């Protein structure tokens, strides 16, 4: 297939391409692309971007052909904000960092953080009273942010850092998406939002540097992630990470771990509120497994239905946009792509494709029963990516979600407020614009 015969997404605007659609109606836009073909030409401004809608092609770029792809030009824009940590690293440097950090993020290594997350969830709910209106979107994002901060920094000197991080990270995340998609001329205009972003970005960098310096001076292993990052050594060379690299890895953990986890927690409680039968089954399972005791790591594997609820939430509200760029010429779906070509894929669009997920807008945890789940094609369900760049924090995210859901639902149920319209907002992740609910003790 010649390049000029690749189907073009409809609705492009001269000079802006499909940028307005990507900014204003991103979810509708990416889910519509499958109607055009397996490879679809999208334009961001004047930059061509090839969207992949077939799971086999997406799996190829993430696994068998991953060495032929870099992060792409759009991701390069994001590096100015999120740094050069594992989530933006490429090639040999990515392999080195992954090798250094992988032992820190195994599920057994993460199991020790169960109590940390549980205590934070308990502290959040202790402020609730019967019938209280709870801003679930804000509360769950704050819970996730505090959990990530405490998993990273457990020392007493971290208390100020946690407060700065809680204040700054949401401001930066709100700006990240626009910095990736909009021309630099537009993101450089000194608006109030831009000034807030610059201030938050500078404060976050400063507090991370201060934490690293304090840990270096005090030494020792506090059992947190920062201690382990500072101590991580290459088993062959004995090399450790520079302070600058540790800084960028800490920065990456906040950007990768906070927004998605907070949004998923909020969506879990939204879906439970919308489906009383599903909520009842979750309550019954948690009551039976915990029997009135605090949730522990050994309980997590027994919460099978709760796990399926979380998996279905990942399907419904996954990230909607990931860019890549070709490093060498290759063919995808009959389309020849020269080196330097930008491509994209959308987990959200794949997860809402009725070819792979019947009734994709229906929240159905039992679609993840083993006999049904095995019918999902490889590459069609990728909430954490796949291959060499699969999310290193997957185990931590699943532990955080399961512990938080079990801890909260053991004592409380969150009921929807009649007449409230919950709108999906796509920035880096898909999160609720506002989600007020009423807290009722169980």
Q: Model-predicted segments: where are they?
A:
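Cytochrome P450 heme-thiolate monooxygenase catalytic core
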Residues: 1-7, 70-78, 89, 93, ...
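N-terminal membrane-proximal hinge/A-helix region immediately C-terminal to the signal-anchor transmembrane segment
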Residues: 1-96, 111, 115-123, 159, ...
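Cytochrome P450 I-helix active-site segment
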Residues: 5-12, 114, 118, 166, ...
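Conserved cytochrome P450 K-helix E-x-x-R motif and the immediately C-terminal K′/meander segment
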Residues: 16-37, 206, 293-333, 354
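Short, conserved phosphate/pyrophosphate- and ester-handling motifs at nucleotide-, phospho-/glycolipid
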Residues: 54, 257, 340
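Conserved cytochrome P450 K-helix/beta-meander segment immediately N-terminal to the heme-binding cysteine loop
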Residues: 67, 345-373
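Cytochrome P450 catalytic-core helices
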Residues: 260-285, 394-412
């Amino acid at each position: 297939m010649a390049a000029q015969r690749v189907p073009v997404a409809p609705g492009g605007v001269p000079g802006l391409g499909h940028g307005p659609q990507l900014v204003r109606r991103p979810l509708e836009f990416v889910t519509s692309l499958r109607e055009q073909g397996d490879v679809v030409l999208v334009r961001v401004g004047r930059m061509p971007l090839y969207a992949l809608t077939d799971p086999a092609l997406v799996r190829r770029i993430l696994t068998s052909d991953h060495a032929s792809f870099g992060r792409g030009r759009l991701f390069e824009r994001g590096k100015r904000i999120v740094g050069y940590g594992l989530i933006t690293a490429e090639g040999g440097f990515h392999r080195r960092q992954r090798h250094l950090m992988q032992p820190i993020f195994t599920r057994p290594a993460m199991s020790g953080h169960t109590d940390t997350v549980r205590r934070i969830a308990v502290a959040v709910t202790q402020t609730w009273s019967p019938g209280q209106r709870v801003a679930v979107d804000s509360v769950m994002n704050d819970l996730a942010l505090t959990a990530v901060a405490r998993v990273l920094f457990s020392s007493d000197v971290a208390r100020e850092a946690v407060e700065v991080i809680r204040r700054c990270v949401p401001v930066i995340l709100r700006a990240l998406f626009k910095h990736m998609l909009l021309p630099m001329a537009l993101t450089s205009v000194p608006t109030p939002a831009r000034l807030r972003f610059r201030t938050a970005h500078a404060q976050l960098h400063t507090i991370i540097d201060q934490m690293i310096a304090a840990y270096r001076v005090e030494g020792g292993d506090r059992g947190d992630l920062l201690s382990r990052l500072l101590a991580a050594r290459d088993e062959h060379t004995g090399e450790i990470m520079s302070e600058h690299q540790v800084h960028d890895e800490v920065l990456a953990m906040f950007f990768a771990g906070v927004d998605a986890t907070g949004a998923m927690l909020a969506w879990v409680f939204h879906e439970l509120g919308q489906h009383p039968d599903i909520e009842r089954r979750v309550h019954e399972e948690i009551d039976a497994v915990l029997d009135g005791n605090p949730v522990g790591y050994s309980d997590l594997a027994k919460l099978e239905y709760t796990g399926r609820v979380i998996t279905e939430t990942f399907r419904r509200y996954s990230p909607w946009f990931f860019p890549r760029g070709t490093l060498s010429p290759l063919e995808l779906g009959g389309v020849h792509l020269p080196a330097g070509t930008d491509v994209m894929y959308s987990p959200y669009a794949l997860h809402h494709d009725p070819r792979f997920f019947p009734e994709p807008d229906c929240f159905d945890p039992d679609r993840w029963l083993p006999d049904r789940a095995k019918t999902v094609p490889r590459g069609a369900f990728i909430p954490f990516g796949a291959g060499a760049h699969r999310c290193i924090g997957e185990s931590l995210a699943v532990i955080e979600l399961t512990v938080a859901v079990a801890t909260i639902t053991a004592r409380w149920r969150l009921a929807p407020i009649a007449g409230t319209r919950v709108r999906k907002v796509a920035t880096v992740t898909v999160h609720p614009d506002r989600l007020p609910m009423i807290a009722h003790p169980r």
